[in-house]
Amino acid sequence: MSEFHRLYFDELLFDFPDLVKVQKDSYASFVGGGDTVFSISDIFASVFPVNDGYGRASLEFVSCRMGEPKHDEYGCVERGITYSAPLRAILRLVVFGDETSGEGSEGVSTEPAVKDVREQEIYMGDIPIMSKNGTFIINGVERVVVSQMHRAPGVFFDNDKARSISGKLNYIARIIPYRGSWLDFEFDAKDVLYFRIDKKRKLPVTFLLRALGLSNKDIFAQFCEVSECRLTKDGKWTVCFVPEKFKGVRLQYDLINAETGELVLAKGNRISIVLARNLYAKGLRYCYMDLEVMKDMYLADDLVSTKGEVLLPHGTKLTKEHVAKLEFLDVDSIKLVELKGNYVFSTVLQYDCSYEEAMLSIYRVVRPGEIPSVESAEKLFESLFFSPERYDLLNVGRIRLNAKFNLSHDESLTVLTKEDIFCTVKELALLQREVGDVDDIDHLGNRRVRSVGEFMDNQFRIGLVRMAKVIVENMATADFDTVMPCEMINSKILGAVIREFFMSSALSQFMDQTNPLSEITHKRRISALGPGGLNRGRAGFEVRDVHTTHYGRICATETPEGATIGLINSLAIYAKINKYGFIETPYRYVRDGRVTDEVTYLSAIDEIKANICQASVRVDEEGYIVDDLVYCRRNYENVFIPRSEVQFADVSAKQIVSVAASLIPFLENDDANRALMGSNMQRQAVPLIMPEAPLVGTGMEGYVARGSGAVIVAKRAGVVQYIDARNIVVASESKDDFWIDSYTLCKFRKSNHNTCIHQRCVVHQGQRVKKGDILADGPAIQKGELALGRNLVVAFLSWRGYNFEDSVVISSNVVRDDLFTSVHLEGFECVVRDTRLGPEEITRDVSGVAEEFLHCLDEFGIACVGANVEAGDVLVGKVTPKSSSPVTPEEKLLRAIFGEKAIDVKDSSLYLPPGVSGCVVDVKVLQRRGIEKVGRALLIEKQAIDAEKTRRDHELAVLTNYIYSLLKEMLVGKVALSTLAPISKGDLITEEALEKIDRENWWKISVDGISSIKLLRQRFVDRFDEINKTYEENFEKIRGDDDLAQGVLMVVKVFVAVKHTLQPGDKMSGRHGNKGVISRIVPAEDMPYLADGTPVDIILNPLGVPSRMNVGQILETHLGWAAYNLGKKISKLLDEGNYSEVKSLVLEIYKNDRKMMARLNEMTDAEIVEYSRSLRGGVPVAASVFEGPKTDEIERLLVLAGKDPSGQEVLYDGVTGEKFDRKVTVGCKYMLKLHHLVNDKIHARSIGSYSLITQQPLGGKSHFGGQRFGEMECWALQAYGATFALQEMLTIKSDDVVGRVNVYDSIVRGDNDFYYGVPESFNVMMNELRALCLNVEFCSDLEKKKDFGDLALAASGQ
């Protein structure tokens, strides 16, 4: 038991999934095919075949394949190229002749005869490949494609609150496809129903219905509520009583039961829905209809006599005369439609039109300015909603439409149907009558996630469609007798479209690579922004807010601060995305009151009708729920229900939070705002050179480390055969299936955010490892657990004002021991170009540069690895040819001394910029193809090849030793059938005899079973050749040239490691949103100290806790103090040799951790003591989110460690030695150093560049800017009346260009007379006024008086 085990206070019942599975599965479905994302072959099949349009030829798709990438992932980063693989497709060109083949129904040939068929494999372009960690390498930079949350295809119903005038809500419906035109329906203030296509000008819905081929009779049948009136024997008309039709109606006649003649309700009463249902329940089925009410109603069907004669056509409005004559007409029943509430019918009556008018009107709206015909309008309308080429709902949209309207269409039908439109209109009409509810657009059942595979699908399709258009153009001019398929393909089109997406899309982002947590969080991010998404400027509060359906799917805590809050979210730790793009979360089945271990995933739609209890529900040993009434969620409301009705249970209390939030212990005790900050600031933590896992963790640290890809994990179980600083070789122990896995460690590799990626081996030679074991730690990882910071002894105390306003006081011991020292890599690039005057040259011989700045260069002019460099040092010496000019006497002298070179070139070397100093850790030299490698490039190539040869030799040595060990087992104990000194024929072969023979000669010994030995030798030779072949390919890649930009001959990259120690001004934080800036580093002897003389490491302000309401940090401090002192106690007992007490103490610590106790009970006393040695630094504990230790458990551990259960200690002032007045909260807390380093922010300059317009210093460190005397500084001098100082500041000391030169001359001459000129900023202001047609000129006092007098006379009109 080599690794330490955290003390858990809960049980992990459900293991965590692959944390970057979202990215990997989505891209895999694009490459190999999936449920919603089409594969590459499917997209080819949907675009091809491409015909020339004249029936002469057709280009068909046969198959495609992806090749192998030219370089590995790191090789692409080094060379600044894209990690991609070539895509090749086999296309078949079918050429048709003039004659035709086949016969139609009348014996006439119908199909053209095939004249020729030509197949060819064609290079279609390079497709970026996803790395094993779920990222893409584009132009040498790691990028992540962020998943996007968008509105799911389908129909949505809402009300338009913004356009409501009278207080009555007008409802709208919108059918949104995945690809194609939007169809909107809306009511105006007069209850007229309109529709829009793609948000263009609206038209009455009559036009759409007519275009769909509906007559008035069809409209009555589809949309109108028809009342059938029957004539009784006594000559009265009756109508069927339907409660929904009478809801809200004020009676205009007495309501009389037609069956009993009883008066049910008197005239004038208003019928509510409750009253109507009660009347129906009491037996009211038919009631008498007043003839006056039938007036102004419309006939829903032709009024036909008993003889079949049409008396009145359908759609006729009944008048007084019609009503009066009804009893005399020969009819016994009529079907009537009331205008009120039948919005579709009323719209048709107001805006009626013919089929042709409807088609032409729709065409004019969609394509204004064009002259339509009925045929073209029909084609356009058909293509808008009913053509698979232009309209696509996806299977998601079809499923949602089927579920909404109870339809049964197949999933493969992804275009609209007439039935979909009819159902939408009917549902909207019901909503306008206040029947039903609108959709919640923020419900996760109405929003789906698009991932990288879907984006690639779309881009690939766009590229192929563009390519198809080019193919058609090329076919028009092609000679089909000789043309080949490759001549019609432009392979750059597809690559350009995909490259444009990765380079310019808002969802293809520069990966946050500050630490492993920031990487994994970026890959699990879900954005509502981007193409087709929301706009941060117009997104309202509702869409940003936490929704009930986010439970277990989207983290309610982690989101950015600022303008994008709520629009960018993170997946919850257990959440996954199903094949339709909906987010699902896992639940355990509950059957007959028993919580089982069977797990299922539910989407937000599936969860609505389920009864779900919490993970913390009380159960007995067999899993049965103890309580009779259980607190559950049903339809997103909290209710108490009987345990027999519970259907599901949460898998874990932490399933509602994201990866970053799950790393915060005691999260439940923090305010939500501070928890948000804590989640975000963990991603800003800088990896330290000596990382330390937190004593108080959550148990998620190991899962995050593995999921991030920063560690090296064993692919298979085996034995570690070889280890050095860069390589680990693991081999199998199996005799039947032998393999060798070689792992290469990253050393001083630069991340996207200039942090150092450095891996360290954690196994030893001969160690047995299992599949999934960690072989090497990465940055910010210790023993396979995430380690973003350090555990410090903290005191919450005000100390001489230095921790005012969240400032932090640090002990000098922290700096001395390099606890928060980090290494950052800065990359510098020098490009050698071929100029029109000749090529640039890299050399150490740079004229005009002092030798002290060239000390780190080798003989080739490039910095040596390991050299310490300071600001101003030359990293790469480079000279550039310069044009000829008149030669000065000094240049003539240089020419005479140094030759022609002295005047022909200028210095263009790469210098280390100001503010940077460090050690050169790596140099890369890239040379253009076709140029012979010389100098340092050959040396670097040789080093790389030697490193590969060393790896190869180690693998071959492992293989050889293994094979010869098997051969030895086959030979020993057998009788030799041949003689090979010192073994004679007939001798029994022994190990001693074999050792005297060279191993290469063992194959010559003949024994029984020689066939198995020959088979072993063949396996050995094959595996040997395979390893050699692999490394020969690697050698060729190393020796290969690089593809550089036009005109570039060579690129030299120099990487400098910069060491950042902790200093005042650096930003630090905890995990609870508690952040501050270091104000002072105090000598350890002046820091407050404990009774045993231990000084505290850090002092925090206690006032920062209650107002921020992040009490979790106090609980962490107390639990950390217990864990820290338990480690000290164990260490003391080990040093004393009191092993029995060590064992009893360890057992007492872990007594509530069932899994750990089971492991300890299986261990011997010696093994327990050996394990306890790993606890010297403290007993690591896991305070899981919502399942952490209670107060009594923390107090138990504090007492066990021999500390006050209050968590407070007596402190002494390190300066005076006096005891503080009261006890102080002291503990062990995990602190992080954030990447807001003071070295990156503060700079100074004495001289530098000026702005060309204002002649004032530039601003900011990036421009090497300086200080300018600004507006507020002028106010300060004005306030003191310092006129002369102000005049100097605004002129010669600022932007008076001429004055600056004159002052310099005056100083040189010893003259104290300064002459002030006009500041350049004043000239800028005058030019701006002139741009406004206001001329400003300088003039003397006399001229001013004369000009003002003339102006006054002109103004008076004299």
UniProtKB/Swiss-Prot annotation:
User: What keywords is this UniProt entry annotated with?
Assistant: DNA-directed RNA polymerase, Nucleotidyltransferase, Transcription, Transferase
Q: Does the keyword Nucleotidyltransferase apply?
A: yes
**Could you tell me the EC number(s) of this protein?**
2.7.7.6
Q: Does the keyword Transcription apply?
A: yes
Q: Which reaction does it catalyse?
A: RNA(n) + a ribonucleoside 5'-triphosphate = RNA(n+1) + diphosphate
Q: Which residues form the signal peptide?
A: none
The record's Gene Ontology biological-process terms are: DNA-templated transcription
The organism's superkingdom is given as Bacteria
Sorted alphabetically, which InterPro entries does this protein's record hold?
DNA-dir_RNA_pol_bsu_ext_1_sf, DNA-dir_RNA_pol_bsu_external_1, DNA-dir_RNA_pol_su2, DNA-dir_RNAP_su2_dom, DNA-dir_RNAP_su2_hyb_sf, RNA_pol_bsu_bac, RNA_pol_bsu_CS, RNA_pol_bsu_protrusion
Query: GO cellular-component terms in the record?
Result: DNA-directed RNA polymerase complex
Q: Name one GO molecular function term.
A: DNA binding
Q: How does it assemble?
A: The RNAP catalytic core consists of 2 alpha, 1 beta, 1 beta' and 1 omega subunit. When a sigma factor is associated with the core the holoenzyme is formed, which can initiate transcription.
Q: Which function does this protein serve? A: DNA-dependent RNA polymerase catalyzes the transcription of DNA into RNA using the four ribonucleoside triphosphates as substrates.
Write out the similarity annotation: Belongs to the RNA polymerase beta chain family.
Q: What PANTHER family does UniProt report for this protein, alphabetically?
A: DNA-DIRECTED RNA POLYMERASE I SUBUNIT 2
What is the name of the protein in this document? DNA-directed RNA polymerase subunit beta
Organism, scientific name: Neorickettsia sennetsu (strain ATCC VR-367 / Miyayama)
Q: Which gene encodes it?
A: rpoB
